């Protein structure tokens, strides 16, 4: 059955890929996005004549009206990123929590399905692999880098509270998604930052010793898993979306350096030279994807090398525009 889908943050990295895939599958899609970080060239790439409504999720009346016009809400809109968290923690907490509350309040009236985009950050300083029901351990309140994780945890709790009131909601926790259209500015994730540097001949800056590990998931795989969360059998569930393939940040830099045939150097930089006071690095982050496999019958399709090549190619193309 085709569903009318509303995607908050749908002009962003994951949201834009999700919108296009839903349209391909025959679902009518509407995007809500306030272009918090500005418009990018890739917004011109969006296919399928998808309407984009440029409003904030804090606009309660507009969001209530839009939610009621749709069957499913993919709530991806958020202020995010470690550096943004460090510099704009108040704005982040107020926007993310209040926006999510607006969505849930609107959805409850008509029992609209909500897929809430959370993050692997909520696992804090625990020991991987992280399972959805694991306890959390965060740093001291003075460590501002945890404000995003704590806010997302509170939003998850709010989602589950609404689930107890009968709202069909599923929480998905993303683990390091990468691919074409990923942000490549000063607040970029490590992969787009490395690719941009490699293509421009700049140093690839590895923070710390580079031994910290992450599990990277190509965006089309993340989208496939997110769409699977529409199924009513995962209502009220929390599901990790990620890969089990661990890579050290040093390995990531080396692989990108090799695939781009770059003349750049790989340079190590202490964390304290990059982030303000209150930063705390997480050495390892790996998901337990048992629930993803069993409840969503999902397995990644895109290999690490293939995903990197496609991402690099996209960055080459926008460099030449």
Swiss-Prot record:
Homodimer. It catalyses: UDP-2-acetamido-2-deoxy-alpha-D-glucuronate + H(+) = UDP-N-acetyl-alpha-D-xylosamine + CO2. One of its GO terms (molecular function) is UDP-glucuronate decarboxylase activity. InterPro entries: Epimerase_deHydtase, NAD(P)-bd_dom_sf, UXS-like. Pfam families: Epimerase (PF01370). The gene is UXNAcS. Disulfide bonds: none annotated. GO terms for cellular component: cytoplasm. The lineage of its organism: Bacteria, Bacillati, Bacillota, Bacilli, Bacillales. It comes from Bacillus cytotoxicus (strain DSM 22905 / CIP 110041 / 391-98 / NVH 391-98). This is UDP-N-acetyl-alpha-D-glucosaminuronate decarboxylase.
């Amino acid at each position: 059955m085709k569903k009318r889908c509303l995607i908050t943050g749908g002009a962003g990295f994951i949201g834009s890929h999700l919108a296009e895939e839903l349209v391909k599958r025959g679902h009518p899609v509407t995007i809500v996005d306030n272009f918090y970080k500005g418009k990018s060239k890739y917004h011109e790439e969006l296919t399928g004549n998808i309407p984009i409504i440029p409003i904030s999720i804090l606009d309660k009346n507009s969001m209530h009206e839009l939610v009621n016009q749709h069957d499913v809400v993919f709530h991806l809109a958020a202020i995010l990123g470690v550096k943004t968290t460090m510099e704009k923690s108040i704005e982040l907490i107020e926007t993310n929590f209040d926006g999510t509350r607006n969505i849930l309040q609107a959805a409850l009236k008509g029992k609209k399905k909500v897929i809430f985009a959370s993050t692997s950050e909520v696992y804090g300083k625990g020991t991987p692999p992280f399972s959805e029901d694991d306890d959390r351990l965060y740093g001291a309140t003075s460590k501002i880098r945890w404000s995003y994780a704590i806010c997302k945890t509170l939003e998850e709790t709010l989602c589950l509270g609404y689930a107890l009131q009968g709202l069909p909601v599923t929480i998905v926790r993303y683990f390091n998604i990468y691919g074409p259209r990923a942000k490549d500015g000063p607040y970029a994730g490590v992969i787009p930052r490395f690719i941009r540097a490699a293509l421009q001949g700049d140093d690839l800056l590895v923070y710390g010793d580079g031994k910290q590990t992450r599990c990277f998931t190509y965006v089309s795989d993340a989208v496939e898993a997110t769409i699977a969360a529409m199924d009513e059998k995962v209502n009220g569930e929390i599901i990790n979306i990620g890969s089990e393939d661990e890579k050290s940040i040093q390995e990531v830099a080396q692989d990108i350096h090799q695939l781009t045939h770059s003349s750049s150097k790989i340079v190590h930089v202490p964390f304290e030279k990059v982030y303000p006071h209150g930063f705390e690095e997480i050495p390892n982050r790996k998901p337990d994807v048992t629930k993803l496999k069993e409840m969503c019958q999902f397995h990644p399709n895109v290999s690490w090398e293939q995903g990197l090549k496609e991402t690099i190619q996209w960055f080459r193309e926008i460099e030449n525009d």
